[in-house]
């Protein structure tokens, strides 16, 4: 049965073109980088690698066109595949930091948002990305399900997301 699953995965892999395969491989290693940093390195030492956290993204007069959004969604979808097939489960923070790095590298400067909610007396934290005000890696209603943290101790926020 395991061999059948491997063959099926390999067949799916063959559907990607070279550019997509490169992005998939690159995303897998970027996930590895962020997982290592979050898991083993003090936040203050890797904080500088994130250029903005929870700051409002303005359009600077730009409009988001369909071609940009299509490319952004394709990058996110491929990175989600890499995250699902990683050596361990990648949570929302690792996904967002990986996707942010992939998108920034291609000139799409997106914002990282951090939010919390209380569910059954437990504090739940979540992160998502937006590009020019549009949520790009989560459902549109994420900001109604989580209270976004605008000003808070980043150390506390990231510790909760670990």
What would you call each of these model-derived segments?
Residues 1-62, 71, 78-88, 148, ...:
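N-terminal accessory/pre-domain segments preceding catalytic cores
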Residues 61-67, 140-143:
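Charged/polar, low-hydrophobicity segments characteristic of intrinsically disordered regions
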Residues 68-69, 73, 113:
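Contiguous, function-dense segments enriched for cysteine-driven chemistry
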Residues 78, 97-159:
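Hydrophobic/aromatic-rich core segments of domains that either
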Residues 84-85, 89-94, 98:
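Active-site neighborhoods of divalent-metal-dependent phosphate/nucleic-acid chemistry enzymes
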């Amino acid at each position: 049965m395991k061999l059948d699953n491997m063959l099926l995965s390999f067949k799916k892999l063959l559907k990607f073109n070279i550019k997509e395969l490169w992005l998939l491989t690159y995303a897998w290693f970027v996930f590895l980088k962020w997982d290592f940093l979050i898991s083993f390195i003090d936040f203050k030492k890797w904080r500088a690698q994130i250029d903005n956290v929870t700051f409002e993204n303005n359009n600077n007069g730009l409009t988001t066109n369909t071609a940009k959004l299509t490319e952004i969604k394709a990058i996110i979808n491929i990175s989600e595949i890499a995250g699902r097939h990683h050596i361990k489960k990648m949570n929302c923070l690792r996904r967002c930091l990986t996707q942010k790095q992939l998108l920034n590298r291609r000139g799409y400067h997106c914002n990282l948002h951090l939010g919390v909610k209380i569910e059954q007396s437990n504090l739940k934290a979540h992160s998502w990305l937006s590009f020019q005000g549009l949520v790009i890696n989560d459902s549109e209603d994420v900001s109604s399900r989580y209270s976004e943290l605008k000003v808070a101790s980043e150390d506390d926020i990231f510790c909760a997301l670990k």
